[in-house]
Amino acid sequence: MVQKYESPVRIYKYPFELVMAAYERRFPTCPQMPIVLDCEIIDDAETDNGAKRETKRRCKLAVDAPYLFKKIIGIDVAYFIQTNFLDLKTRTLNIEAINETFSSRIEIFEKCRYYAHPENPDWTCFDQVATLDIKNFFGFEHSMEKMGMKQYSQTTQKGKEIIEYFINELKKEGISHVDRWKEDETTEPAATATTTVSISSEKPPLTRDNSILDADYIATYLGQLSPLQESKLVQFRKKIEETNHEGKVPDYQTLLRFLRARDFSIEKAASMLQESLQWREEHRIDDILGEYKTPVVVEKYFPGGWHHHDKDGRPLYILRLGNMDVKGLLKSVGEDELLKLTLHICEEGLKLMKEATKLFGKPIWNWCLLVDLDGLSMRHLWRPGVKALLRIIETVEKNYPETMGRVLIVRAPRVFPVLWTIVSAFIDENTRSKFLFFGGPDCLHIEDGLEHYIPTEKIPSFLGGSCITMIHEGGLIPKHLYKSESVEEHNGVPHGHEHHGLYKSVDLKPGQMFELVIKNTDPKSVLTWDIDVLKNDILFALYRTDKDLEQSFNDSFSSVFDNADMKEGVHYTRLEEKVRCKPKEGVQGSHEMATAGTYVLQWMCPPSCDGPAQLMYFHEILSSANYKGSMTSLQSGFSSNSLQSR
C-alpha cells in the first residue's frame, strides 16, 4: 500500500531571496539534521541569463533503524538523488528527491516547493508531498512503512526550524536582505526594501478562501498537530473536495473533528462526514440558528443554558437534569422537538467555540457540559424518556464528534448508576473518558473540586458559588400544556403515540382487578414501573411472596392471594401501600427486589366507581449486575405528568 505525506503550507515571514540564501547554508551538512551525512553536487547548470538553475545532488543519509534490522538488510546508509529547479524570475524553487538505495524494492518520491507568498511578496511559502511504496522488503514491508513515515515526519518537522536558524545566522553576519534577480541593467529594479506586514488583525494568510491550510492557521485555530496529522488533514480536505462537487466543503475545524473521531483514518472519516453532510442538508441544519423558534414550554421549564466559560476557555453549558420533567417535556413538545432543541444547542456551541477562539487567542474546538443531578430519581428512568435520550445521543455522536471537551457530573445520587449503565453504552469511548463525577452534595470544598475546572467567580450559586445564572430551575410541567389528543376518539387507545408496543392497555370494570405476576431469580435487581391512568380512579399496590404463583387470566374479580391458605403478613407481604391514582395522573416508581421470590403488581378499579377504568402500564427489571445494589429501595412517586392523552 502506498503511504502518502502531504504538508500544510509553511510560511516564512521573509522574502524569497533571503530564504534561498538560508536554504543553501544547509548543504552539504548541518548539525540540525544529523541524519544527513553528506550531499555531493553531481550536476549544476544555469540558464536564461542566470535566472534559472538546476542542481542535482547525491545525498547520503544514515539509516535510523534498530541495530538488528540494519544487520538483516545489510546497510547503515542510504542514498537519495535530489534535483532542485530554481527560477529567480518567478521566485520559485521546486525540489524532487528519489531513493537510489533499494530502488527495486522501495519507491520514495518527494516533491517540495518554495515560492513567494501570493498575497505578500515579502513572505515565502513552502509545501511538500511525499509517497512511500514498499514493494518487497524481506518480509518487513509493514514495519518499514511505519518506520519510514515516522522518520520522514520527524525530519520534515525540523525543516522550518533549520531555515529560521540560518536566517538568524545571516542576520548575525549583517545580511538581512538579498536583492531580487533582475534581467539586465536597463530593467527597472524591483522593490528591494524589506516590508514589515502586520497580520494581527487579519485572518491568517492563504485561508481567506478556506481552501489552503497554513501553519499560522493551524497554530491559531486548530492547535498542535503532528506532521502526520497535518498531512492527513490536508489529504482529507482534498478527498472531500473531490467527492463533494456541488456542496460546500466544511472548514478545517470540522474536518479535524471528524478525523479525530475516526482516529485519523481518512476513509472512515470521509464516510462519517458524507453521511453527516447529507443529514444536515435533509434536516436544514445550516438554517437552524436563524429559523429555530423556542417553544414556550421549553422557555419556561427547560433547565439548561450557556454560562460563561470553563478555565480552559471552553463555552460552558449547564443542564440541571435532576430538575427536568422528562415526561412532561416529551408530552408537551414531543421527542422530535427535544431533538431539535438539542441540535440548536449544538449549533450554538459551534458558534461559541469560534467566538472563544478569538476571545482567548487560542484554539477552542470543544465545549464543557456541567450536569447537575440533584433531584434525579427513578422518574427520570421513564423508558420513553430514556429512549428519546438515546436517540439524541446517537444523533449528536454521529454529527457533532469531538465537540465535548469535558463533562462534569455533579451531585450524583445513588440512583445515577442505573441511568449511567443504560446510557453509557451508547456514548463513544473517547467521550466517556471525558466524564468527571462528583457524588456528594458539596462539589466545591473537596480535592479536585469544581474550582479546578470553572473559575471561582463563575461557579453557579445553586452549587455553592457566587454567580447568579439565568438558567430556569425547571420543575413539573402543568398538564394543560400537554399536546391535546382525545383518547376516546381512538377506542380508548392512544393513537399513534411514540410508545406504542412498549406500554400495555388494561380496561377494568368497577371491582375488577389486574395482577401482574413477576418471578424474580435475581436478588438486588430493581423493579420499575410507570402507570398512566386514562379513565376513573385506580388503586395500585405491590406485594411479595415466597410461593410460586402463576399469572391468572380467569376471575379478574379476585386476587391470586384470595386462596384460603394465603394470609397477609404471613404468606405474603404488601411492599407498597395501596395508592389511589386519579384520572390523567401518572405514577412512576421502583423497588429493589432484595430477595428472590414472586412479586405482584396489582391494579384495581374501586367498586364505588360509576364506570369502567382504563390504564396503561410499563414495567422493567434492571439487572443487579448493572445496578450493583446502589440503593436499598425507592418509593413510588406521583407527578402531574398526567396522560391528558398521548
From Swiss-Prot:
Domain PRELI/MSF1, residue spans: 2-175
Gene3D superfamilies, alphabetized: CRAL-TRIO lipid binding domain (3.40.525.10), GOLD domain (2.60.120.680)
UniProt xrefs under CDD domains: SEC14
Disulphide bonds in the chain: none
Short name of one Pfam family: CRAL_TRIO
Cellular compartments per GO CC: mitochondrion
Ranges of residues in domain CRAL-TRIO: 294-471
Record key words, sorted: Mitochondrion
Domain of life of the organism encoding this protein: Eukaryota
InterPro entries: CRAL-TRIO_dom, CRAL-TRIO_dom_sf, CRAL/TRIO_N_dom, CRAL/TRIO_N_dom_sf, GOLD_dom_sf, PRELI/MSF1_dom, SEC14/CRAL-TRIO_domain
Recorded coiled-coil stretches: none
Name the record gives this protein: Protein real-time
Organism whose genome encodes this protein: Aedes aegypti
Annotated gene: retm
